[in-house]
């Protein structure tokens, strides 16, 4: 079974070594590695070439392609098109792969050669109070996942090259949320099944969550802008606007200026905060196991701030994406739902 591992890079000099070292340490060696560089200006391609030369005995053939200006979708498509294997395993620069990642990711094909795609999992490399709080707020734990509805990130996923071709590749018109639309297109190929993806929770990759609120804002602004461009999660965004623009002002107004029982406003605010932060606080029990009691309290206090920053970033980014979509409404690629037919709406981490 020939397996090609593909990834894209752009100015990843500071992070790419983690991925390359973990690729060299795989218990199931890939048959080839294809990397597409989007035109890095920080010497990433040179670093990759030097690493490959130094670790030639530990690596399969490595093909490095340079495609200046390629976004992540274009980079993945270029790498997959150049890959020789009928099975593609995709990951991202900057992650650290578990040594058994590839072995676990391709194992379903040994049990069922008709497997179409496999969804791996991802866990945070969180070491300090802030990154632990960030991970608990925005990332699911294995216990949160329903295998029948899980849509994988392309930092840990495998699929046949035929499935990629039938999906039309990754959508190059979309700069963010591109792997979500690709997942929908793969799922549409197995309409009689709950999911086209076999869930492989032990195919794990580790990555570092955002280390500042500024970078987190930018990330979630772009995610929501991608939602707007692709017309994703209308109800979810509507609920967010209603919460912040209607429910929250109403509760605050009653708490401070109500004509009767102002305590009801405060009670509503407290209940809202608890519901808002309950699951992240529960995740802190697992993710913050190595923190001191004081550090866990500090992480718990950060959770509401992280949630608010993420939500405000989404509320700022989503209408920008919607406006972009309206300006480009004549683009046939935007009508992806029509092309896929009645596609099921699966849950994603939010």
Regions found by a protein language model. Name each.
Residues 21-30:
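Short, acidic, metal-binding catalytic loop of nucleotide-sugar glycosyltransferases
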Residues 29, 37-46, 95:
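A conserved acidic beta->alpha catalytic loop
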Residues 43, 93-108, 184:
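Acidic donor-binding/catalytic loop of UDP-sugar-dependent glycosyltransferases
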Residues 67-83, 104:
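Glycine-rich, basic loop-to-helix element that forms the pyrophosphate-binding segment
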Residues 88:
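Short aromatic/hydrophobic "clamp" motif used to bind/position activated sugar donors
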Residues 100-130, 194:
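Conserved donor NDP-sugar-binding/catalytic core segment of glycosyltransferases
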Residues 171-234:
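Catalytic donor/gating beta->alpha subdomain of glycosyltransferases that bind UDP-sugars
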Residues 246-324:
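Membrane-embedded multi-pass helical conduit in multi-pass membrane proteins
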